[in-house]
Design a protein with these regions (language model features):
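Short loop/turn segments at secondary-structure transitions that flank enzyme active sites
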Residues: 51-53, 81, 90, 111, ...
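Structural signal for terminal/edge beta-strands and the immediately following C-terminal loop/tail
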Residues: 268-284
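Short helix/loop capping segments that flank catalytic or ligand/cofactor-binding pockets
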Residues: 53-57, 94, 173-176, 229, ...
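Alpha-helical scaffold segments that mediate packing/assembly in large oligomeric complexes
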Residues: 71-74, 79-157, 180, 204, ...
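Assembly/oligomerization interface modules of large self-assembling protein complexes
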Residues: 2-80, 147, 276
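Extended oligomerization regions of viral-like shell subunits
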Residues: 38-39, 135-260, 264-266, 278
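Short, Lys/Arg-rich flexible segments
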Residues: 2-30, 83-94, 110-118, 122-124, ...
């Protein structure tokens, strides 16, 4: 919480743009889902529940009429913000300040957005979808069987798996999965140490994909063509040295302590067809 005065200064547009770009690069959800620009009041988006169906016809016969089944959802932007204090030395070295902002703020925004989509933290409102309650598939007993079960469930809901998001815990489980000859299933060699693809679909890694529960969730898989996130104006960044900020139980008077604070905020929304997503789970 902070009280920023009218002496706050807007940072250069290119810095805000770079923070947004880095946020998108560090968010697994933003890398996989489709982005749209939102008006401040939000927008209604169509959600296709079933596709039109073509049919063979004889010469001279009437052509069949088939329509897709479509529902609508309201895509609304909610504000996500973070304030970080810095020592005044950073303000005297503007390039160093910009480098620090570009390096630190995107990760904070990306982590919180991913954690919200995955149900690790509470969603900001009713018009924000999460994957918290989607169908779960156990991968601890038999990782390959669990992944195939997720693929099957998604296909049965007219989805096509095109992306995985795994937590570090999930990565460890998959790295230890072997076939009957004890060869690793999901990497070509132990020198790689990463899992770029699972069953032919790209893989992203995010700490937010680990959600404690019964059972614990360690990853997500789905048809990301049916997921969309919206932004209003990109990341807005302001700085102030005349504020009093509260961090937990600690109160910081910036002027008194020769510091300044940077506030970054972005308006984001997320919607998806939850039937074409699965959780990857393990029992504790």
């Amino acid at each position: 919480m902070a009280n920023l005065t009218r002496q706050s200064l807007q940072l250069p547009t290119e810095v805000s743009s770079e923070i947004l770009q880095n946020t998108q690069e560090q968010s697994a959800v933003m890398q996989l889902a489709r982005q749209v620009q939102l008006p401040g009041t939000g927008v209604s988006i169509p959600v296709i529940l079933s596709d039109p169906e073509a049919a063979w016809v004889k010469e001279g016969d009437s052509k069949p009429v088939s329509s897709a089944t479509v529902d609508t959802k309201k895509l609304v932007a909610y504000k996500l913000a973070v304030i970080e204090p810095f020592s005044m030395e950073f303000k005297r070295d503007i390039p160093a300040l910009y480098d620090a902002l570009v390096a630190r703020l995107p990760l904070a925004l990306a982590n919180k957005f991913d954690a919200t989509v995955f149900g690790k933290v509470d969603k900001p409102g009713e018009d924000f979808d999460t994957l918290k309650a989607v169908t779960g598939q156990d991968i601890k007993t038999d990782a390959y069987k669990g992944l195939v079960a997720a693929d099957l469930d998604i296909s049965e809901h007219d989805g096509i798996v095109n992306g995985y998001v795994i937590s570090p815990r999930c990565k460890s489980i998959l790295l230890t999965a072997t076939d009957t000859t004890n060869r690793p299933l999901f990497i070509n060699s132990v020198a790689e140490g990463a899992i770029p693809m699972i069953l032919g679909a790209p893989t992203k890694q995010s700490k937010g994909a680990y959600v404690t529960g019964t059972p614990n969730t360690v990853g997500f898989v789905g048809d990301w063509t049916k997921a969309i996130y919206g932004t209003v104006e990109g990341v807005q960044v302001t700085i102030s040295d005349q504020a009093t900020i509260t961090s937990g139980s600690e109160t910081i008077n910036l002027w008194q302590q020769n510091m300044f604070a940077v506030r970054a905020e972005i308006e984001l929304g997320f919607r998806c067809d939850t039937t074409v997503f699965n959780r990857l789970t393990v029992t504790a």
